[in-house]
A protein has these predicted regions:
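ATP-dependent carboxylate activation and anion-phosphoryl transfer catalytic cores
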Residues: 1-170
Length: 170
């Protein structure tokens, strides 16, 4: 049992030549029914020292298994900053734009570059972390029916406006 857990994900990118870099970590603890609702980078909960350890563990793990492509290592963290490996997603996750906004790195482009057999176009020291990003998911649910999925026709859509705003939809 982990009291007050935090779900932290580390984004990595690796190539066939043994190069692996991290692109920071995301806080994914705000969930409902095991579905992420809010993702944030960097996590305001994780101390810098712990973040550095976690990022190093993620990169080393991927190097040891020879992983190449985009991937996400998921960890559970307790209130004392101890972290535990949960799983690795060997794909690009829905929340990857949070990482792109904080690094300026186009993860889709680089995933294609690596899949084509090319080396990563950057080294760890080339990646600059700047600012913070938050992703909020909107679910179509019926609050009067235990929040069951509620498909329907979208009749009005008003996009938010403002600086530094990215709007992705599917």
């Amino acid at each position: 049992y982990i009291e007050n857990p935090h779900h932290i994900e580390v984004q990595i990118m690796g190539d066939k030549y043994g190069n692996v870099v991290h692109l920071g970590a995301r806080e994914c603890s705000i969930q409902r029914r095991n579905q992420k609702v809010i993702e944030e980078s960097p996590s305001p909960f994780v101390k810098d020292e712990t973040r550095k350890k976690m990022l190093k563990v993620a990169v080393e793990a991927c190097k040891r298994i020879g992983y190449y492509s985009a991937g996400t290592l998921e960890f559970m963290m307790d209130k004392d900053q101890n972290f535990y490996f949960l799983e690795m997603n060997t794909r690009l996750q829905v929340e990857h734009p949070v990482t792109e906004e904080c690094t300026g790195v186009d993860l889709v482009r680089d995933m294609i570059t690596v899949a084509a057999g090319n080396p990563l176009p950057y080294k760890q020291e080339d990646i600059k972390f700047s600012g913070a990003a938050i992703e909020c998911r909107i679910y179509a649910e019926d609050p009067e029916n235990n929040f069951m999925p509620s498909p329907g026709v979208i009749t009005v859509r008003e996009a938010p406006e403002g600086r530094n705003l990215r709007l992705d939809s599917a």
